[in-house]
């Protein structure tokens, strides 16, 4: 539906002359990323999803900036199980994984 492209192109200096009337629309970010990696064009993606591809040189970033999408990930579980150690271990593991991620260095635009 091109929401991410609209968010991106609203930033000054990034899209004054770009039309959203044409182009392919994919059902998932992953499909767009695969198409870009294969040389079919430019795609909007999630930095977490492309970090390894950028580090390995399979995908390039056209600009060193990222635009916040307003989307996020949440870990939830029932209140009654809040104190269970296995949920705390999962939470701690996920936080450690996120902290260890090597994301591309970009300026983040709100």
Sequence positions of predicted segments:
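Short beta-strand-to-loop elements that line the ligand-binding cleft
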Residues: 18-28, 66
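Short coil/turn segments
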Residues: 1-3, 25, 65, 79-82
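C-terminal effector-binding regulatory domain of bacterial HTH transcription factors
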Residues: 47-56, 66-110
């Amino acid at each position: 539906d091109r929401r991410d492209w609209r968010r991106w192109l609203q930033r000054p200096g990034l899209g004054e002359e770009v039309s959203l009337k044409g182009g392919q629309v994919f059902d998932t970010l992953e499909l767009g990323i695969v198409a870009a990696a294969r040389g079919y064009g430019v795609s909007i993606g999630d930095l977490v999803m492309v970090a390894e591809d950028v580090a390995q040189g399979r995908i390039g970033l056209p600009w060193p900036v990222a635009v916040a999408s307003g989307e996020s990930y949440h870990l939830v579980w029932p209140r009654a199980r809040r104190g269970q150690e296995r949920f705390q271990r999962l939470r701690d593991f996920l936080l450690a994984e996120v902290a260890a991620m090597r994301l591309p260095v970009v300026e983040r635009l709100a």
